[in-house]
Curated annotation (Swiss-Prot):
Reaction catalysed by this enzyme: (2R)-3-phosphoglycerate + ATP = (2R)-3-phospho-glyceroyl phosphate + ADP
Alphabetical GO biological process terms: gluconeogenesis; glycolytic process
Cellular location(s): Cytoplasm
Record-listed E.C. numbers: 2.7.2.3
Gene name linked to the record: pgk
Full protein name: Phosphoglycerate kinase
Keywords: ATP-binding, Cytoplasm, Glycolysis, Kinase, Nucleotide-binding, Transferase
C-alpha cells in the first residue's frame, strides 16, 4: 500500500485535520464504550508531539444532515478526552466550515461531520471547505474507509497533503499481511447468520485460504447441503447449491455433532447430539464437543488465521462452548507463533467475553470496511490516499 504516512511527516506548526472514528455509544450524555476513543488517543498524542495545531472530527450516529440536535453532538467525546490525561485542553467547535482558530498545544474537536449538508454524498464543495481548514489531512478512520464521503474522500482530494494515520496504516499492514502474503497454512473462520451476506467473502477466501471453517447459521446451510435435517434452524435453502460448490472447492469441515434447543432464549436448555439426529422441532445453536475439538486441532496447526464471526449463539451461556473452544484455540495458536487477525462486531464481543484481547495479533476496528477489504474490494478512502501519494 503506497500511501503517505502521518508518522513520516514534519507537522510542526501545521494545521492538521484528523478524521477519526469516534462513533461511540452514548448513554445519558456519557460515553458508554470508549474502545474507539482509546484507539485514537495515540494519534492525537503523536500530532501534539510533532507540534501540530490539531483538529479532529468524526461522525456520531445517524443525524439528519443540516439539522443539529444535542443528542448528535460530540460533546461527550470532548468531555472524555478532557479527562484522558492528554496534557492539553480539548474544546468543541460547532461552526467551523468558514474557518477555525486553532493553536499548538490544544485539541479542537470539530462537531459531528454528518450534520453537515452534503457529507454523505461527498459534495465536492464541502470537501473543499474541510480541506481549506488544514495543511495536512490525516485519514485514521478505517471503519468508514469503505465509504466515499466528504470527510473521508473529498477532503483527501483537495487538502494540500493527505496521509494515513497510525491506526489506518496498522489496519492496512495487518490485513495485507493476512491476505496478500499469508504464512501457510492459512485458515479463515467465517461465522454469522446468513450465507447470502457472506457469500462474496467466502468466495474470495476460498481462493486464498488453505482451509475454511464456517460457523453459526452459515454452517447450518452447509449441514443441510450434506442432506441432514436441520429442524427449525436458521438456514438458506436456496443457497444449498452454493454451499455444495464451496464445499467441493475448499476444505470445509461440517459439524458431526451439535447443540440444539427448542426455543431461542437465554434459558433454553441445550441438548448435545449427532448432526444426523436433529428433530423437526429443534434448532442448532452451537457445535458439539467433538466438532469443537476437531476445529481446535485445525486452528492450532494454522500459521495465519483470519476470524470473522462466532460458531454459535455465544450470547447464551448454554450455547457458548463452541465459540469459547475456538477462541481459546486461536489464542493458543497465536502464542505459538501464528498471525491472527479478527474483525466484526460479534467477533469483538466474543473476544471481550472470553478475555483473549491481548492474545490476538491484530483486532480490526472496521466492520463493513474489514469485510470489503477481505472481499478484495477497493476502499475509496484508501484509493484516494494512494492517488495523492503517487501524484
Amino acid at each position: 500500500m503506497s500511501v503517505i504516512k502521518m508518522t513520516d511527516l514534519d507537522l510542526a506548526g501545521k494545521r492538521v485535520f484528523i478524521r477519526a472514528d469516534l462513533n461511540v455509544p452514548v448513554k445519558d450524555g456519557k460515553v458508554a464504550s470508549d474502545a474507539r476513543i482509546r484507539a485514537t488517543i495515540p494519534t492525537l498524542k503523536l500530532a501534539l508531539e510533532k507540534g501540530a495545531k490539531v483538529m479532529v472530527t468524526s461522525h456520531l450516529g445517524r443525524p439528519t444532515e443540516g439539522e443539529f440536535k444535542p443528542e448528535d453532538s460530540l460533546q461527550p467525546v470532548v468531555d472524555y478526552l478532557n479527562n484522558a490525561e492528554l496534557g492539553v485542553p480539548v474544546r468543541l467547535v460547532q461552526n467551523y466550515l468558514d474557518g477555525v482558530d486553532v493553536q499548538a498545544g490544544e485539541i479542537v474537536v470539530l462537531e459531528n461531520v454528518r450534520v453537515n449538508k452534503g457529507e454523505k454524498k461527498n459534495d465536492p464543495e464541502l470537501g473543499k471547505k474541510y480541506a481549506a481548514l488544514c495543511d495536512v489531512f490525516v485519514m485514521d478512520a478505517f471503519g468508514t474507509a469503505h465509504r466515499a464521503q466528504a470527510s473521508t474522500y473529498g477532503v483527501a482530494e483537495y487538502a494540500p497533503v493527505a496521509c494515513a494515520g497510525p491506526l489506518l496504516a496498522a489496519e492496512l499492514d495487518a490485513l495485507g499481511k493476512a491476505l496478500k502474503e499469508p504464512q501457510r497454512p492459512m485458515l479463515a473462520i467465517v461465522g454469522g447468520s446468513k450465507v447470502s451476506t457472506k457469500l462474496t467473502v467466502l468466495d474470495s477466501l476460498s481462493k486464498i485460504a488453505d482451509q475454511l471453517i464456517v460457523g453459526g447459521g452459515i454452517a447450518n446451510t452447509f449441514i443441510a447441503a450434506e442432506g441432514h435435517n436441520v429442524g427449525k434452524s436458521l438456514y438458506e435453502e436456496d443457497l444449498i447449491p452454493e454451499a455444495k460448490r464451496l464445499a467441493a472447492a475448499t476444505n470445509i469441515p461440517v459439524p458431526v455433532d451439535v447443540r440444539v434447543g427448542t426455543e431461542f432464549s437465554e434459558s433454553a436448555p441445550a441438548t448435545e447430539k449427532s448432526v444426523t439426529e436433529v428433530r423437526a422441532d429443534e434448532s442448532i445453536f452451537d457445535i458439539g464437543d467433538k466438532s469443537a475439538e476437531e476445529l481446535a486441532k485445525i486452528i492450532k496447526s494454522a500459521k495465519t488465521i483470519l476470524w470473522n464471526g462466532p460458531v454459535g449463539v455465544f450470547e447464551f451461556p448454554n450455547f457458548r462452548k463452541g465459540t469459547e473452544v475456538v477462541s481459546n484455540a486461536i489464542a493458543e495458536a497465536t502464542a505459538n507463533g501464528a498471525f491472527s487477525i479478527a474483525g466484526g462486531g460479534d467477533t469483538l464481543a466474543a473476544i471481550d467475553l472470553f478475555g483473549i484481547k491481548d492474545k490476538i495479533s491484530y483486532i480490526s476496528t472496521g466492520g463493513g470496511a474489514f469485510l470489503e477489504f477481505v472481499e478484495g474490494k477497493v476502499l475509496p478512502a484508501v484509493e484516494i490516499l494512494e492517488k495523492r501519494a503517487n501524484g
